[in-house]
Structures are given as C-alpha cells and as structure tokens.
C-alpha cells in the first residue's frame, strides 16, 4: 500500500517516463485514445489496475494506471512506488480536498470539461484548485479552473 501525505515537497520530476511510448507518437495521442474509452473504464472494477482509496472518503475508486500517470506527476510517483511494493493493487492517498476528487477523476478519464466545469461552484472552486495543483495537473485542467474563476467568480464580483 502506498500512502502519500500532502506536504511542501510533493512535487515530482515531470520528466519521469510513465509508459513506454512508441517513438514519434505524442503522449497526447495516447491520452486522446484512452479518453475515447473513458466512460467505459471510469470506476470499472473489472478492468481496473488498482483500488484507490482517498483519506476522508468511504467510497473506493477503481483506477487505471495509464489514465492517471499520463496526466499527473503525483500519480506517476504513486504508481512507481506501488510497483515496488508487495501489494500494488491498493493505493491510499491523502488530498487537500477529498470531497471534490470524484468529478476531477471522472474528468481525467473522459476529458469532459463541460461536465467537470458544471460540478464547480463558489463554495468548492478553491478546493478543486487545490487538488489540481497538488496532483500537478497540466494546462488543460488548469485552464478549466481559470475559466470558471473568470466566468463565475470575477464576473459576479464585478456586478
């Protein structure tokens, strides 16, 4: 079991090669291909690589390594550590905001930015952002958070 506690030093090397890529094929192509099957794989016990438990939540998530390591240096490190332990089928993590994780995880699988955007509100936006930052998610996820901030929070403050 791999347990990671949020701290100041949770940043991981982004140049870690998570999977063996075919030379000349960008990682974004692999992610696009995975996301085409994302709805089928999201939280699917039958096809999952591991059970993911988030401290503070009672519901487990059934996750697939490839979806997560392509998008998060945090998960790259988690799966690297888990592969070196005797039991890599259960992963336990601690996040800044457990209650906003499920929609974020679904977004990582499907890439459905509108659905994820719609789960944000004034009360949870900052918590969503904390998870995005903690997991080291890339420009795409950050842009969705930024769009929410601009469209919903700044707009309402100006009126």
Regions from the PLM with identified roles:
Residues 48-137:
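Canonical BTB/POZ domain core
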Residues 4-5, 14, 22, 69, ...:
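Weak global preference for isoleucine
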Residues 1-63, 112-113:
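N-terminal BTB/POZ boundary and linker segment
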């Amino acid at each position: 079991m791999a347990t990671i506690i949020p701290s100041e030093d949770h940043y991981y090397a982004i140049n870690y090669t998570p999977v063996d890529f075919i030379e000349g094929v960008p990682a974004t192509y692999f992610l696009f291909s995975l996301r085409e099957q994302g709805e089928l794989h999201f939280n699917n016990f039958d096809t999952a690589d591991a059970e993911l438990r988030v401290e503070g939540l009672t519901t487990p998530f059934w996750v697939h390594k490839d979806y997560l390591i392509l998008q998060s240096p945090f998960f790259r490190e988690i799966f690297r550590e888990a592969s070196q332990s005797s039991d890599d089928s259960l992963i336990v993590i601690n996040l800044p905001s457990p209650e906003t994780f499920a929609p974020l995880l679904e977004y990582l699988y499907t890439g459905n930015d509108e659905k994820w955007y719609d789960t944000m509100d004034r009360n949870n936006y900052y918590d969503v952002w904390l998870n995005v930052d903690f997991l080291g998610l890339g420009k795409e996820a950050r842009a969705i958070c930024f769009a929410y901030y601009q469209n919903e929070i700044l707009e309402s403050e100006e009126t």
